[in-house]
């Protein structure tokens, strides 16, 4: 059988692509080296932020607004346990923060619902938060967080119900191109398709070693909290920048545990074996202490944590482009630790590519050629 589309990597983007392409009527094969959702990539740990006024640059705003529409649609499949939780997101940092300047600019350009607070206003609204006098907060009322593993599980189930073929726990070992399309090699045999999507995450260079993607080991952890820090008490998800430039992100507490991670830093790695479990690097359990001690002093000790991996591009912007010399293969990689919120729209973009539809978005900033 020759498929319309083969998806290599069925984590966040691949799961979405499988669903949207199958829903569009294509004959699709989803593949993954493991059984998604799983612990081997970048999507585990239960939750991911979604921010609309984007500190990484306004070029992302049209994408994230469409992503939000798709997340809302997906959430309707899980109304008892919604995939998207509109907790709000408070972005904290010094008044001269470049990141916060980008958030404010994005909000102004796209007329987003963002409220600016000074230090006293932040602490009055959320007494659990402490910030210096020179800090400001930009509160995104309509943003919140996503249940990442539930989302992937839902997409995979919906795709399967729609007739999508799924080959999991079976790594793709090679990709070949010829006049007939794309062929992948696996331990289960060879499979052919007219087109392919490569969204293999951290280890995409195992298949395409020439790509400018650097795996980085990262950790996040859960710390002892209480009901004051919960969504029920209107405690928001957050990003926070310390005076030294270190950037953190976190979520409202659930079951008396508040999850937090540090966005910058981490350990450069070159193989999956180098991504050692949480606590095997001496700094893992204390990485969030500078932020917690200064901004959330009521949070207690580290309860547990996990390691994941970023697939960083050189400029930490996404790579969304066809494979050089092979216009029938789309790369979506280099998501650099801020990609999950876009998984829905990136999956839709992949499905459009498979149908020869022109994208509704300007993807020029994400081309591979910018690194030449």
From Swiss-Prot:
Cofactor note: Binds 1 FAD per subunit.
Gene: solA
Cofactor(s) recorded in Swiss-Prot or TrEMBL: FAD
Protein name (record): N-methyl-L-tryptophan oxidase
E.C. code: 1.5.3.-
Subunit structure: Monomer.
Role played: Catalyzes the oxidative demethylation of N-methyl-L-tryptophan.
Family, per entry: Belongs to the MSOX/MTOX family. MTOX subfamily.
Class of the enzyme per the UniProt entry, highest EC level: oxidoreductase
Gene Ontology molecular function: flavin adenine dinucleotide binding; N-methyl-L-amino-acid oxidase activity; sarcosine oxidase activity
HAMAP family for this protein: MTOX (MF_00515)
Reactions it catalyzes: N(alpha)-methyl-L-tryptophan + O2 + H2O = L-tryptophan + formaldehyde + H2O2
Taxonomic superkingdom: Bacteria
InterPro entries assigned: FAD-dep_OxRdtase, FAD/NAD-bd_sf, Me_Trp_Oxase_MTOX, MTOX
